[in-house]
Amino acid sequence: MLLTTAACASSLLNRSEPDKSSSQGHQTLTGQSALGDWTSDAPGVRRRVTVADLPRPYQTRSVDNGAHLVPRPEGAWPKVPAGFKVEQFITDLDNPREIVTAPNGDLFIAESGPGRIRVLRGRSAKGGPEVNTVFASGLRQPFGIAFYPPGPSPEFVYIANTDSVVRYPYRKGDLSASGAQQSVVKALPGGGRLRGGGHWTRDLRFRADGQKMYVSVGSFTNDYENPNAPEDHRADILEFNPDGSQERIYAAGIRNAVGLAIHPVTGDLWCSVNERDALGDNLVPDYITRVKEGGFYGWPWFYMGGTQDPRHPGEHPELKNKVLTPDVLLESHYASLCITFYNGSSFPKEFKNDGFASEHGSWNRARRVGYKVIRVPTKRGVPTGEFEDFMTGFVTAEGDVWGRPVGVAVASDGALMVTDDASGTVWRVQHSR
């Protein structure tokens, strides 16, 4: 992980945004009230977490409390706000992770476990896809998917494996790869920048003008507890030309930026981040933020704007005042994964251009948190600092877990599509007009 980057110009999109004054009447939980668990989750509940709300390290012991997964109980169903409804679009997928919408409306899904990309097309009279097929297979833990160039007529679909970036020729409407796989970022022996181990997901997005590609690479370790660990070019967001050349670090000190997204109004790069473990139930907050070019976000020595990690006392004092505070602090251990922005037209206007992010759920906390999809309100492309429960209900009254959201995408008809790797399901959320 390097700490400096060269400057480059980023392009912004000049697009209008509707008035969101009607969404400002929500009551927001703040302070200690914002630090709850799954029993306080419900659609419409808003929270704001600040650095001042955070406890000192080790106020609670670190616990291993992973999700106890069970089949979906009879009658259990995701909960969404009044006026919305949830449908089971498809189930029995194998480890569905990221989902993206192609320009023609097809849904591309990374099934990371079996190493393939699946395509779903249309919607049948029974509510499921009309076409369900495999676009490409033989991949290595694929996660990120992006079409290039951005816009209505892409020529390639890019895939981020755990140790490389590849692409396939693509013509609008292709249901299977129409040409051979092409290497974009190679994993060279002993020097591959995207080598496996540690945090394995790699997301990728293109700048709005298509001139740059961003790839997120999580850390090898939790808090750099092993100084011999291979952390070079990890815990970073990397920037490349679309052909894989001109690699550089765009932002550093980001422990595990699982999800990347480009805001449709500003063109800003955003990320959703899994922060470090083993400091207690309410440390360190996961977060969602706009990514500042050349920015340093603290890992592993600091967190949340210059707070020293107690496992690295006195290390790198010269960096303390350079650590950026993220835009939206979530609860600790949410395991925030993918993020998208609502660019459809079927939700109420106050949702336009707001973020939706999947919270996969905790393991390092005595009381479970996460296991839901949240809304991230924005105003003219700037996050308000709050987040709101949107899709909950994946935890039983006994604390067992039957669903874990991963991917989020806006379908061509404006529905929000959510992958769930616990049940192998894609959920479809639409507004009831």
List each language-model region with its residue ranges.
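Beta-propeller domain segments
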Residues: 27-82, 154, 166, 201, ...
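Predominantly a core beta-strand signature of beta-propeller blades
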Residues: 85-86, 129-133, 180-184, 234, ...
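Surface loop/turn motifs at the tips and blade-to-blade linkers of beta-strand repeat domains
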Residues: 88-93, 134-140, 184-196, 249-253, ...
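Blade-loop segments of beta-propeller domains
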Residues: 92-100, 112, 116-150
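Conserved beta-strand element within WD40/beta-propeller blades
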Residues: 109-110, 158-159, 215, 271, ...
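Asp-box/WD-like beta-propeller blade repeats and closely related beta-sheet repeat scaffolds
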Residues: 130-132, 136-149, 155-156, 161-209, ...
